[in-house]
């Protein structure tokens, strides 16, 4: 991906699964090495990705180099947002960017696609949870810290623009 080529964001298909699983594992290893433990990689496998593909909840960012980023977008998140009203928000999870493409707008493109999808679904908000070390990234992308869950997970919310 040259610096001028914006990533193309689309709903993932079954042919993307292996590449997405590798990308998520690589991202989790990188975050863990930086002191920002991510999701449980043992749970990130083909079955995990297939579930999101079947529900059209897995987005990928791609360019001439292949898949360079991904995330999930769901209609609910009972673990971190149990009291949320159904339909008031969409929930972004598992945002991962190939390290060779960090700083090139991949996260921004994925988040903008999630915002658009949330609006299309009639949701007023896009929410996520993240490690506190990642709050700055999301705040720079327009999100606001809402709460801290269990002392270790920042709950981040964003109103639709």
Feature locations, PLM:
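Conserved GNAT-fold acetyl-CoA-binding loop/helix
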Residues: 21, 25-48
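Conserved acetyl-CoA-binding loop-helix of GNAT-fold acetyltransferases
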Residues: 97, 103-116, 140
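Conserved acetyl-CoA binding element of GNAT-fold acetyltransferases
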Residues: 83-99
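Conserved beta-strand in the GNAT
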Residues: 60, 66-75, 91-96
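A short beta-loop-alpha structural element at the N-terminal edge
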Residues: 8-22
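Conserved GNAT acetyl-CoA-binding A-motif
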Residues: 111, 118-130
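C-terminal "cap" of GNAT-fold acetyltransferases
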Residues: 84, 124, 130-134, 141, ...
């Amino acid at each position: 991906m040259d610096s001028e080529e914006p990533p193309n964001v689309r709903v993932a298909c079954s042919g993307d699964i292996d590449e997405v699983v590798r990308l998520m594992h690589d991202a989790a290893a990188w975050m863990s090495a930086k002191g920002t433990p991510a999701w449980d990689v043992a749970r990130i496998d083909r079955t995990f990705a297939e579930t999101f593909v079947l529900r059209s909840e897995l987005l990928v960012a791609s360019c001439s180099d292949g898949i360079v980023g991904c995330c999930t977008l769901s209609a609910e998140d009972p673990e971190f947002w149990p009291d949320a009203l159904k339909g008031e928000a969409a929930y972004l999870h598992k945002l991962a960017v190939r390290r060779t493409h960090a700083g090139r707008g991949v996260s921004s493109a994925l988040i903008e696609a999630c915002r658009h999808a949330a609006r299309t679904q009639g949701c007023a908000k896009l929410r996520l949870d993240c490690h506190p070390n990642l709050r700055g990234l999301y705040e720079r992308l327009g999100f606001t810290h809402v709460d801290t869950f269990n002392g270790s997970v920042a709950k981040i919310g964003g109103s639709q623009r």
